[in-house]
């Protein structure tokens, strides 16, 4: 049965792929061949390849019964699509193979995922069953389901997104949950094998009324600290923060096996753009801690659905720690995308300075002299629909998008960093922009939807002058 369901899913995907349009399809980000994509799953280096699985609906560009899509890469940048890895339909995953993770268990690629069943009709979140399941593969392509390995504690129904790792000769698992009081929490388990698990403790939980569910947990050490990374649902916006439908971020602290997680800071968003959710981390072949997120947001318009697909991933980002602060930089492998180079000489800008008439896939580096720039706002624009600018009056860096025909309008912003200089590294793809600020101190990621004729890339300044100290641009391919 499983094979026939996989075969049917692959056939449906092939049919959808035949009619997929490319108006917004990315040049250098991982997106589904067709159909729907959301959370990254099972990110791992295995058998001399990077593997990225993901939540996938191959029958439609809309969310539906979740499969696990699959892609592989030798550099985390150039991805090759593989056959669909998991299809729902067995007793314990009848209505979805929800998110999870991957580990190498003595040469066996092991996927730990959530089996989801609707108990009272599809979409009724008040009546579900969620259990953790195992699927295994020796070749890294074809998987056999091994059944349920963990059931939820008494009184808990929402119980999903297992992230598994090995530490101190023990398997560990974090799972996102909603307690009976509708409060988000992360549960920690320890295992003698991938099939035998014991509850360790509630690793962390929301304050009452703060958020009702904590999804997609991850737990890892970096520098001198541990980071609990997760995606809370139900947080209220506070000023400029938490403006998206749902958030993703980290809590720092100290932990060792058998101990409490001693939090040393508050929840901080990982990305300050419009579109970032469900990040998952993994260890690269050389030991770097890498994170990839879903570059979309629940309940947002997704214009690419008109062309038979939806969803894409962020660039792979290397995490590092500096003075207790988490930094995110594009993996150095991203430089392999660079083709034609265009230097941007230092200049004073008082109106518009065109960089490219038709920017499809580019990397731009800009260094602004904040103290010497008196324009009310100045920065980079793509067509009339996307601006990344410094607002001198509010002293904030603003990422604004305006596509009224797509029902998309609004901005995200962060405080300008202290100091005289602002360094920006910007990746623009067909339908996305990712901005790395001051060598990874902050990141802003958003989907954008310019029409093909709306891709003029320019620098600009309004009501004053802006001083560019350094600039560079690369075509990417």
UniProtKB/Swiss-Prot annotation:
Q: Which SUPFAM superfamilies match?
A: Arabinanase/levansucrase/invertase, Concanavalin A-like lectins/glucanases
Sorted UniProt keywords: Carbohydrate metabolism, Cytoplasm, Glycosidase, Hydrolase
Instruction: List the Pfam families hit by this protein, alphabetically.
Output: Glyco_hydro_32C, Glyco_hydro_32N
Annotated residues that bind substrate are located at 36-39, 55, 63, 98-99, 160-161, 215, 298
Identify the metabolic or biological route this protein is part of.
Glycan biosynthesis; sucrose metabolism
Task: Give the domain of life.
Answer: Bacteria
What is one GO biological process annotated to this record? sucrose metabolic process
| Protein's UniProt keywords contain Hydrolase | yes
What reaction(s) does this enzyme catalyze?
Answer: Hydrolysis of terminal non-reducing beta-D-fructofuranoside residues in beta-D-fructofuranosides
**What is a single cellular component term in the Gene Ontology annotation?**
cytoplasm
Look up the EC number in the record and give it. Answer: 3.2.1.26
So what family is this one in?
Belongs to the glycosyl hydrolase 32 family.
Per the entry, what this protein does is: Enables the bacterium to metabolize sucrose as a sole carbon source.
Put simply, this protein is called Sucrose-6-phosphate hydrolase
Q: Which organism is it from?
A: Escherichia coli
Which gene holds the coding sequence for this protein? cscA
